[in-house]
Every structure is written in C-alpha cells, then in structure tokens.
C-alpha cells in the first residue's frame, strides 16, 4: 500500500479511537448547557407538565435531501437521559437522504424525549450538514483521482465529530491536530533558516510521521521538492502555477532527480467553481476549510406519533433495541 494511503488509514483509525472518548463527553457538555448544568431531564420545567409514566413514539424526519451523519451522538443523548428509550434505525451514517424520509423511530417517556430533542437534533443536523457539503465537493471530482481533505478550521470542541462527518461525506482527513503530522509553514521556515533545515529537523525528531511543507511560490516549491517532504502544499497558487508545479514534480521523478514522488496539495481560493479545474492539473489533494468552518445544518425535526408507523416495513429496520445495549455499534 502506498505510504500516503497508510497515513490516511492510520489517521482514520486514530480518529475513531478518539471518538470513543469524545462522543460521551461532548454529549454530556451539550446536555448540561440545556439542563441547568446537570444531565437530568427533571431540570426541563416545561416537560414536567407530563406525567413521567406517559410514553410515546417519535420520529426523526429530514426536510431536505442530504447525507446522514450522527447516529452515535443521537444514541448517546438518550443513553445519558434514559437508557430504556428504544430506537429503531432506518438509516446509517453515510446514507443518502431524501426529503421527508424517516431516519429513526424512538419510544420512551414524553418528557425525556422532549428534554433530549434539541441536543440530539443539534448534533445530527450539524454533522449531516457537513457530510452533505463534503459529498457535494466529492461528486464534483467524479472520474478524477484527486481527493478532498478537511482542515483544522473546525468549531471548538467538535474537531473529531466534524472530521468524522467529512469521512461520511466521502472526503478524507488532513491531520487531526498538531500532534499527528508535521506541517511546516512560513514562520517555521523563517525561524529554522530554510525549508531544507526544517524538513531535516522534522525527520530527525520523528521519522515515522508524515512531513508536509507549505510553499507560496514556484521557487519555494523547487526547494521543497529537493527535500524528503511527503506532501507539498501549494498555498494560493494560480491555476498556471499548479500546472507548472505538477510538471516540475513529474519531470523530476521521471529523470530520477529526486528520490521519491511527493504528493501535491492545493489550498486557498478553493470553491465549487474552481475545484474541478484545480484537480484536472494532476494534483493529489485539495484541502477545503469551508467544509467544517461555514456549516449549514441539515433541516431535521422530531415529531410525535400516536403509534408506531406501520408503513415502515420490518425488513428496512436496521435495529430495534434499547440504545444502551449496543453503545458502540455501527456508526
């Protein structure tokens, strides 16, 4: 397997490990925001209007097309409020959604379902919105080898969640944080004297981590090309400069002028209009901060039903269980 793909796979595994810790903690924090600093549905004064033994069915419905993400977060909300609440899932993370589609059915106390409604929807709407936007970008690159990457431009506290949503939308993850890859930028280069010094220092410090160098000109690109950097980021390059960078890299590889073939990443001035033309230059990655920075939540809602919706064929149900029975099932 190419080293670049190993790095992506390792990053995905690391992300999933971090999520096991992050999901319960982020859900707890969100519930406390809504419930007076406690994870206690009794703090919801409006829901106290209902008797605690009054149970009801509810459905989560999408009001627009999109890509679903957030199953584990919704489950965790109701695990923490009342693990006896049951959920019947009709979709899984990464599924294509159509307007008015039922995503899941819940059954439990009226008061508790209402207490968790907004927190659960906030997570699922946000993550599904990110997955949907990512998928829009990915589909624009149909037939090309270029991959879409996210960035560290994420909402505070939701880094791992948003990066998981990127995967559900068909994108790939850039580094998760400052600890899992080197990214040598302008100020690093200035402080260390040169691109070569920076890369050499990184290799000595930790030879197992990927090294990426950001360049702002073709001259800097040529300097980075002569090092052992794994990835070279072309920051705010014009389309012509991208084409030239690819040609220079490929020529150097063909002539054995460099010992390895670094991957090229484009960053800056990336929009849906420019995306495909950038990819057609032959670059390997396009990183897009907009994916996790400017989020448009998917329109979802929860509604109560008089009884279980019999229109849903039993064979379509992915699972019906107490959410506490399989806390870390299919995400």
Predicted regions and their residues:
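Acidic/glycine-rich phosphate/pyrophosphate-binding loops and surrounding catalytic core
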Residues: 2-227, 231, 243-248, 263-266, ...
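Positively charged, low-complexity, intrinsically disordered RNA-binding extensions
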Residues: 237
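Active-site loop ensemble at the mouth of alpha/beta enzyme cores that anchors a bound cofactor
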Residues: 301-306, 310
